[in-house]
Amino acid sequence: MLARRNRVTSGADYRIIVRRGRRTTTGTAVVSALAGPDDAPTRFGFIISKKVGNAVTRNLVRRRLKAVSAGLLHSVPPGTSIVIRVLPGMERTAWDTLQEEMASAVTRAVRTI
């Protein structure tokens, strides 16, 4: 579970990260990363549209992404903000594949900052 300080919570922050951040894509997500001040915590945010599925499916995907992100917190530099926009099809992705894809995408996005 991600602590509140490790989550992107405001709509304005989402907008800034998606517009100004560096993008990396996988088959099931678009990852945007934006560097911030080194004294700020690493933050993750998720955008899951209704095209992914009904509310139960979207919440399942969100919970899985939160679990993956919690494991990636210490591998991302402090102050980095990451937004993961889910594409349709992620709900069918196996857990192991999801972990590998997200770790790879986040690493690539952070490297380009």
From Swiss-Prot:
Presence of the UniProt keyword RNA-binding in the record: yes
Pfam families reported in the protein's UniProt record: Ribonuclease_P
GO molecular function: 3'-tRNA processing endoribonuclease activity; ribonuclease P activity; tRNA binding
Example of a GO cellular component annotation carried by this entry: ribonuclease P complex
Gene3D superfamilies: 3.30.230.10
Reactions catalysed according to its record: Endonucleolytic cleavage of RNA, removing 5'-extranucleotides from tRNA precursor
Top-level taxon in the UniProt lineage: Bacteria
Quaternary structure and interacting proteins, as annotated: Consists of a catalytic RNA component (M1 or rnpB) and a protein subunit.
Listed HAMAP family: RNase_P (MF_00227)
Family: Belongs to the RnpA family.
Protein name as annotated: Ribonuclease P protein component
Taxonomy of the source species: Bacteria, Bacillati, Actinomycetota, Actinomycetes, Micrococcales
